[in-house]
Regions:
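AMP-binding/adenylate-forming catalytic core of the ANL superfamily
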Residues: 153, 178-203, 355, 362, ...
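Conserved C-terminal "lid"/linker of ANL adenylate-forming enzymes
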Residues: 230, 553-559, 567-568, 586-662
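Conserved pre-ATP/AMP-binding loop-to-beta segment of ANL
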Residues: 108-110, 231-233, 244-273, 280, ...
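Conserved AMP-binding/adenylation subdomain of ANL enzymes
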Residues: 292-310, 320-360, 375-377
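Structural core segment of the AMP-binding/adenylate-forming
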Residues: 170-250, 357, 365-366
Length: 662
């Protein structure tokens, strides 16, 4: 039975003029003429995109003028998961699309703006970028890199990272990167799985006004990769190349125009990694063609990004959003790379950057929005942010108060596009569209080509009810395989074990009768109290709306063997009256959520443990407090702060042993 849906406040609705000039409107007309279908609105287009997969994805390829070298024989012989074979026979090259001159602005317009934390800027036009990529391509060739070989990189969000990736892709080789703030064991766990040919590595990085040398990390990585044919030193801190490494300048010493090696549609483009909460991180391989099509579709149609636009997303090279940001080149936009701390010297840093470079699409994480909100920032009163047309938020669900803050303090005529997807598919499967309204606290729509549904435990499709987020039809950017997973069992176990032939994403979702969505948290971190299920995201929206709460984590220690307790861990703001705030939290949770969800224990902690990708470590904490050994519940190398995790567990155990009751 379906639940009820009461529409929340509409925060933004596109004007008729804005909707008319959106690329998605032109694409809809293109599809209507091509198919003879009537497509009166977004939902009709979405239905077409998920019901006629060959028709939709061939339309995407033709609309964007994909540069085929070998023509595909068909689009999708069989719509099966896993194992969908997209565009068999088709060959292409990612870098050729990223470096194309089609419809780009004036030749002197920057293709890339790279900004360091200290304000140093580097602007590259498309011809300049092509020249650098050509030089790096020649250098990689000299080191023996060819199609299918792996190039790995320990790099910040910099020009060298971009050039290294595009040069790798131009050769038909496979890219994989980690941020230099990763510890050596984390990097080694990732890179050793894919047996790279070449390593690119910086000597250090700058963050929060400080310099961090990583020479020792690089030495350990090189020792762990005995099959390297070459290692390249990038002097971010100005040091000389150590023995056995060549300098970046030497790699790129010979100028050349890049050449593009065509590879099959399903050939690997890059390897991304799961957070690796337990065991080794999953080495997720996405295809050249799948990413080209998906990012063209997402960035041009959903984000309305194109020539003349400037695209900034705060990210590191260890998060899939870096790969997504680079995709801005595919649609002719200028990409803005920021390397540093978003809080140095203060939280206005990125907003000043957005003003200076007239950013059109500004993306961030939901925790960054919360930090700006709690700091009382009012960016639109201090800066001219009128160039921004859309704000993107991902990483975790954007709270209702976060929506309100963006609307009130950044711009009332802004599309607020909270979106969710993940590393597994390197895109959003639910998000926004320039012709769809923004409702307070909700994700506006399901993405084109993403047949997202909400499933009951028995596989019944739900509406206006919370269920398991599943994808019931293949998408081109789904993994073609996990590296080293010879029989495909690890991939099948990761996504298809619960509903055969259906992708289980691992989140709770509610899809409304309007077509909007609400992500309710991870389905393996559900709060189940007296039979009433609740996602953790809903819990955090309430708890973290309290000004005295800096951060929080909630776990339900119940299991199949019996009821457990509901534990709320809180990082209180300095000077907070812990006893009074705890009492207020209990009252707020009782009235805003339910009496069943009032925590049995409220425990002050110094910090909430997070993964390297910034996600709260709910499941490992739940497992450990349920009795699992720490070493089997979490990979320490997956944690952003292993020592902080130890301090968190110590505080939790001491409070529980003392019978702490708030």
């Amino acid at each position: 039975m379906n639940g009820t849906d009461v529409a929340p406040e509409v925060l933004w609705k596109p004007s008729p003029e804005r909707a008319a000039r959106a690329a998605i409107t032109d694409f809809t007309a293109f599809v209507a003429e091509r198919t003879g279908r009537e497509l009166p609105g977004y939902h009709a287009l979405w239905e077409f995109s998920t019901q006629d997969l060959p028709g939709f994805w061939s339309a995407v390829a033709d609309y964007f003028g994909v540069r085929w070298h070998g023509q595909p024989t068909e689009v999708l012989p069989a719509a099966v998961m896993p194992g969908a074979d997209w565009f068999p026979g088709g060959t292409l090259n990612y870098a050729e699309h990223a470096l194309a001159t089609h419809e780009r602005g004036a030749v002197e317009d920057p293709a890339v703006i790279a900004v360091a934390e200290d304000g140093t800027e580097q602007l590259l036009t498309l011809p300049q970028l092509r020249t650098q990529v050509g030089a790096a391509q020649l250098g990689l060739r000299r080191l023996g890199v060819g199609a299918g070989d792996r190039v790995v990189a320990l790099v910040p969000n910099s020009v060298q990272a971009l050039v290294g990736f595009l040069a790798t892709a131009s050769l038909g080789a496979v890219w994989s990167s980690c941020s230099p703030d990763f510890g050596a064991p984390s990097v080694i766990d990732r890179f050793t799985q894919i047996s790279p040919t070449v390593l690119l590595a910086v000597d250090g990085y700058r963050y929060g006004g400080r310099e961090f040398a990583v020479a020792d990390t690089v030495r350990k990585i090189r020792r762990a990769l005995p099959g390297l044919a070459g290692a390249v030193h990038i002097p971010a801190l100005g040091t000389a190349a150590p023995d056995g490494m060549i300098g970046w300048d030497e790699l790129t010493s010979e100028a050349a125009e890049p050449e593009f090696t065509p590879v099959p549609f399903s050939a690997p483009l890059w390897v991304l990694y799961s957070s690796g909460t337990t065991g080794l991180p999953k080495p997720i391989v996405q295809s050249v063609g799948g990413i080209v099509l998906e990012h063209l579709k997402s960035l041009r149609l959903h984000w309305d990004l194109g020539p003349g636009d400037r695209f900034l997303w705060f990210t590191t090279t260890g998060w899939m959003m870096w790969n997504f940001l680079i995709g801005g080149l595919l649609v002719g936009a200028t990409i803005v790379l920021f390397d540093g701390s978003p809080g140095h010297p203060d939280l206005m840093t990125l907003w000043r950057l957005a003003q200076r470079h007239r950013v059109s699409l500004f993306g961030m994480s939901a925790p960054y929005v919360a930090a700006c909100q709690k700091a009382g920032l009012r960016p639109s009163t201090e800066l001219d942010l009128t160039a921004i047309g859309a704000i993107g938020s991902t990483g975790s669900p954007l709270s209702t108060s976060g929506f309100r803050w963006i609307h009130d303090e950044v711009g009332k005529d802004l599309q607020i596009a909270s979106f969710s997807g993940g590393t597994d598919i390197c895109t959003g499967i639910v998000g926004g569209a320039p012709t769809v309204p923004v409702w307070m606290g909700e994700i506006s729509c399901r993405a084109l080509g993403a047949k997202v549904e909400s499933y009951s435990p028995t596989g019944e499709s739900l509406l206006d009810e919370v269920g398991e987020l599943v994808i019931t039809a293949p998408m081109p950017s789904m993994p073609v395989f996990f590296w080293g997973d010879e029989d495909g069992s690890r991939l099948r176990d990761s996504y298809f074990a619960d509903y055969p032939g259906v992708w289980r994403h691992g989140d709770w979702i509610r899809i409304t009768s309007r077509g909007s969505c609400v992500i309710e948290g991870r389905s393996d971190a559900t709060l189940n109290r007296g039979g009433v299920r609740m996602g953790t995201a809903e819990f955090y929206r309430v708890v973290e709306s309290v000004p005295e709460v800096a951060d929080s984590l909630v776990v339900d220690t119940s299991s199949s063997s019996g009821d457990g307790d509901l534990l709320l861990f809180v990082v209180f703001e300095d000077g907070a009256d812990v006893e009074a705030v705890t009492k207020a939290l209990r009252t707020l949770i009782r009235t805003e959520l339910s009496p069943r969800h009032v925590p049995g224990v409220v425990i002050p902690v110094p910090a909430v443990p997070r993964t390297l990708n910034g996600k709260k470590s709910e499941v490992p904490v739940k497992r450990i407090l349920g009795g699992a050994p720490v070493e089997s519940a979490v990979s320490r190398d997956s944690l952003a702060d292993p020592a902080g995790f130890d301090a968190f567990l110590q505080a939790a155990r001491e409070a529980l042993a003392a019978g702490s009751r708030g």
